[in-house]
Amino acid sequence: MNSKMKFVGNWGRLGMKFNIWEDCPKVPITELLSFIVDNRGKTVPTANDGWKLIATNCVTNNTLFPVYEKVRYLTQETYETWFRAHPMPGDILFVNKGTPGRVCMVPDPVDFCIAQDMIALRADDKKIYNKYLFAVLRSREIQQQIYNTNVGDVIPHFKKQFMDQLLIPVPDRKIQEKIGNLYYQLSYKVELNKKINENLYVQAQAIKK
């Protein structure tokens, strides 16, 4: 378990007088969303360049935003006409198949599309803070809920109709913002330090040559 997940798993008493998992009302996640971007069901026609089309391998619980590994591409026309909807900045990518439950934030600007095996969750800001929801979805408790509802012996699959079984603790808004912002900032710093170290390593290798 990496440092970020340790933090999430133990945040219940982080400078607070209560535990969100024990002392807060729990609400089905579907009641906390304003929209779900779902383009699953058809195979997207691809091209040699253009808009990035990311797959589930691009979404991990170890990075704040999706990574662009083995991406495919599609034309502007396909982008404008094929999809039901597109992710917006601040949405949360949620993997349904393969390794269900992996989540990443959607960056600003958005330079990719999603189709098979994942959806994007749009938090209802009147009900829940999106960064808090993101942090909670990565928590040990919610990841276990997702694992317990997976179906499929060969390829695990979290069905969309199971979404209302994910119960999210909903504390006061100020607490949501405290947890969400802290987790987001921690994730950002970890990711930034990783990139700095990778860059230093590349420079060191170049000097040796």
Predicted feature residues:
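A short beta-sheet element
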Residues: 55-56, 73-138
